[in-house]
């Protein structure tokens, strides 16, 4: 039996053989894709009206998070499905986007003016998610994957399941969501206008040709100091595979720090290449193809770094991975 399973058998039958077992095995291996497609299609058609009602009845930030997660779930379930059902989903996503835009327009200024009453947002991540873990004396890797969507995370999650357990939650980005604003807000714990006022030497204006995210490490330091902590930290930004391979070899030395911040830009670079590079554009013509390409990139990273993941887990109880879009 072990040898058969090791050779990736499709199924097995045990004597005495029941005719229904034989029929089930044949259907499973010959018609499985058709059955799954039909079942998924019927499932979404039944859910369509409920999701529409949920969109209309979404009045809180938690409501909208649930809508988003449900739409992402069905997008992944239907990615290989017939065009008619996929068109229904795209129409529903557009409806949700329009309604969500109105929700943000109505509430955003209140969130800015009343930080204690708003949902978890970019400036709050370190204060509410990172610092409490450091307060317990645990070492922490904070990995920020730029321009990484929830549907892409769902596509690659199983690649990391061997090494991590997951505690997932969503947060709301500030506006604009552009890197120079939202990512600086995460690392500083401040709104962009506050960064400009409190640390003018670390803020780069929109019109400037200088890189807008060159001061992320100093911004992290200012946030730690503002909370009167003395935690040690490292900061690394991975732009290419060569730097990534070099970083992996330094994992043991990073264990001396209480906080290690790693920014991964490859998904963002892939996103830009999707519009600027003809070959990448052809490889990722659809959202499903784009997710598949993202998975391939993550798989390559996983193969290169499996040994170092084990080393990290031996020294750190928790690793937070922030998916930022």
What are these regions (language model features)?
Residues 1-11, 24:
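Alpha4 helix (beta4-alpha4-beta5 surface) of REC/receiver domains from two-component response regulators
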Residues 17-26:
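C-terminal output helix
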Residues 27-40:
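The C-terminal output helix
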Residues 46-51, 113-136, 150-239:
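Active-site nucleophile/metal-coordination loop of metallo-enzymes that catalyze phosphate/sulfate
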Residues 59-109:
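Low-complexity, highly charged intrinsically disordered N-terminal segments
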Residues 137-156, 186, 259-264, 293-319, ...:
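Beta-strand elements within well-structured catalytic alpha/beta cores of enzymes
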Residues 257, 261-292:
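Active-site His/acidic residue clusters
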